[in-house]
Curated annotation (Swiss-Prot):
Gene (UniProt): trhO
Chain's role: Catalyzes oxygen-dependent 5-hydroxyuridine (ho5U) modification at position 34 in tRNAs.
Organism: Rhodopirellula baltica (strain DSM 10527 / NCIMB 13988 / SH1)
Family: Belongs to the TrhO family.
Known EC number: 1.14.-.-
SUPFAM superfamilies registered for this protein in UniProt: Rhodanese/Cell cycle control phosphatase (SSF52821)
Stated name of the protein: tRNA uridine(34) hydroxylase
Length: 323
């Protein structure tokens, strides 16, 4: 188990990963990617990125900031890997191949799970709101999926899910602490109120694809925690690499696209999203009398006003018509 930096270790796609082998006939590739790397001229990348994605029929969202790139995108299988190669080999005026070490997690599906192509400029590629944190300077120790079970079995390890409530609701690792956050901005407050380097000598954290843990482990290191670990590549990498019979994962993994969640085979799961409150819905929840597609569910129906219902119904009609 070694400490390294986010932009220094390329995460290449194997010739045939377990996820790819189990999805050989699926025509769409989905790439969840990130890379912490200095981008002083990140604003200038927006248009060439958007144009290349549009030309290749790739949809989804990329975030660009002075600290790097983050996003999830999807497109025709035969065009996605060349696009990732294009990113990794890109040379900028002031840098040679800044995205060479970009971390990428692959999954596959029948249809592109995004409606639009977006390239956005941000202050942070994952918003924690702590300006002193720099994952390029210091992060926790990366743990490979095959070593994760042994680490979390250690009784001295405090295991923390750094994701938000609505994500944890549908799946997590057994024994993990839920910080009960609504956004990643709330995570520092959770740490301040609940964790102590003396009482919690070993802390292990995980998230969907690894990016939040780059900052959460850096934050704990800054606050004096010495043994801080995080799952390399996040839950998605664990689900790909770990045989299901040996897995400690329980449930499905929330993803930020129209699939809503993926199962242990990284295939679209059983959940849909309530567009009223943004929480995932089981098939059983959709049978509730308060559920109305695109409008509300039993969790939020009592808070939805008449005008909100009217607007949401109109929007759902537009979506159904492909507008």
């Amino acid at each position: 188990m070694t400490e390294s930096h986010a932009s220094s270790v390329p995460a290449e796609l194997p010739a045939e990963s377990p996820a790819e082998a189990g999805a050989a006939d699926l025509p769409v590739a989905v790439a969840a990617l990130y890379c912490f790397t200095p981008l002083p001229q990140f604003e200038s990348l927006r248009e060439p990125f958007r144009q290349r994605m549009s030309d290749d029929g790739i949809r989804g969202s990329l975030l660009l900031a002075g600290e790097g790139i983050n996003g999830t995108i999807a497109g025709p299988r035969e065009l996605m890997e060349p696009f990732i190669d294009w990113l990794r080999s890109m040379e900028l005026d002031d840098q040679a191949t800044p995205f060479r070490g970009m971390d990428v997690k692959w999954s596959y599906c029948e249809e592109i799970p995004f409606r639009k192509t977006k390239v956005r400029l941000k202050r942070e590629i994952v918003t924690m709101g702590v300006s002193s944190i720099d994952p390029l300077r210091s992060v926790g120790t990366y743990i490979e999926p095959q070593d994760w079970n042994a680490l979390v079995d250690d009784p001295d390890v405090t295991l923390i899910d750094t994701r938000n409530d609505y994500e944890i609701e549908i799946g997590t690792f057994e024994g993990a602490i839920n910080p009960h956050t609504e956004s990643f901005r709330e995570f520092p407050k959770f740490v301040e109120e609940n964790l102590d380097p003396q009482k919690h000598p070993k802390v292990a954290m995980f998230c969907t694809g690894g990016i939040r843990c780059e900052k959460s482990t850096a934050y704990l290191k800054e606050r004096g925690f010495e043994e801080v670990y995080h799952l390399r590549g996040g839950i998605l990498n664990y689900l790909e690499k770990m045989p299901e019979e040996d897995s400690r994962w329980q449930g499905e993994c929330f993803v930020f696209d129209n699939r809503v969640a993926v199962d242990h085979q990284l295939q679209a799961g059983a959940y849909e999203l309530c567009h009223g409150c943004g929480w995932p819905l089981t098939p059983e929840m959709k049978q509730h009398s308060d559920y109305e597609r695109g409008v509300a569910c039993s969790r939020c129906a009592a808070e939805v006003t008449y005008e909100q219902r009217k607007r949401r119904r109109m929007r759902q009609q537009q979506l159904d018509q492909g507008v």
